[in-house]
């Protein structure tokens, strides 16, 4: 079968369902896909079973089960991620395996917010999911409208507690299962025939309006992690790597950041696949020729960046998932003072883990394999780090944890 071309006509947004186990995240994912397919024949229907049996993926040495569904509204194209198990959510959000521009928090109206509801909201805040909309599910099981109001109030309070705008976040109340069943009975149902189906249309209109279109990588400030360095006789030093974001032109001034003192230089040439380029953009694997830079001035682990856009740091706070023994992680706990390697972009840097903090703010004495914990890290030399950056924790070449920087300390 010939592959269909991806038409880039609408803005693209990455979105995901989050919330407590059995509150209906996967059912809602299936319902959105079915409801949009009932109106627009270009949306491919994904059944509940297909979404629920999520394939394994590997991100930063960790196996994660995630399901990807794509669909579109009149305004946008969406890639939607759903995870079958709670541990998969934690790993997915921390490794950034599936980056989310926004999330739909699913809360069962019959049960109200539960422990994982809280944990997913906290995680969304820590890893920088910018906006959340709420779907109160299983509304067909609640007869008392006052109870629905009470649940909504509880969820709003919880969102505010974790610094989301709880008072203004949009809520939609419905039943994912009944919407899905209506679509199964009549796959071309469209809008205006069933109140539960219409609730899903309402939800997607809100997602369209409320979750902002993300800034494209190309429009951000230039950054490239250096993977390799070599010198060309008579021409100078070339740094190679993949441009993470932004764009770079020949003749521009850039900074070399990390490991040593920041150095300013000019791009005198760009190459890709042995051909010269005038400009490299996000996603390109390029060689960058640098003026007046010796091969000894630059090494793997440094980054090339737009001047002033990123600075080197040694101390930061991070949210970390520690791998279990079964996932190839440690067999034993570790304690404050533990010194593993932190794999940042392209290189390992040794660092000391100074302390651990649990979700409730208390200090933890030790960390077990399988835990998720907030930690304070001190690296032995400065690296270009920023909030929201992902890294792996390694010990003797094997990955023992994955983390995301939540706060720069120094």
From Swiss-Prot:
Segments passing through the bilayer: none
GO molecular function, one term: mRNA binding
Record-linked Pfam families: GTP_EFTU, GTP_EFTU_D2, GTP_EFTU_D3
Single GO biological process annotation from the record: chloroplast organization
GO cellular component terms, A-Z: chloroplast; cytosol
Cell compartment(s), UniProt: Plastid, Chloroplast
Region called G4, residue ranges: 137-140
Catalytic activity: GTP + H2O = GDP + phosphate + H(+)
Protein name as catalogued: Elongation factor Tu, chloroplastic
Region of interest (G2), ranges: 61-65
Gene3D superfamilies: P-loop containing nucleotide triphosphate hydrolases, Translation factors
InterPro entries per the UniProt record, alphabetical: EF-Tu_GTP-bd (IPR041709), EF-Tu_GTPase (IPR050055), EFTu-like_2 (IPR004161), EFTU_2 (IPR033720), G_TR_CS (IPR031157), P-loop_NTPase (IPR027417), Small_GTP-bd (IPR005225), T_Tr_GTP-bd_dom (IPR000795)
EC number, UniProt record: 3.6.5.3
Residues holding GTP: 19-26, 82-86, 137-140
CDD domains, sorted: EF_Tu, EFTU_II, EFTU_III
Limits of the tr-type G domain: 10-215
Chain's role: GTP hydrolase that promotes the GTP-dependent binding of aminoacyl-tRNA to the A-site of ribosomes during protein biosynthesis.
Stretch list, region G1: 19-26
Major location category of this protein: plastid
Region called G3, residue ranges: 82-85
Domain of life per record: Eukaryota
Keywords: Chloroplast, Elongation factor, GTP-binding, Hydrolase, Magnesium, Metal-binding, Nucleotide-binding, Plastid, Protein biosynthesis
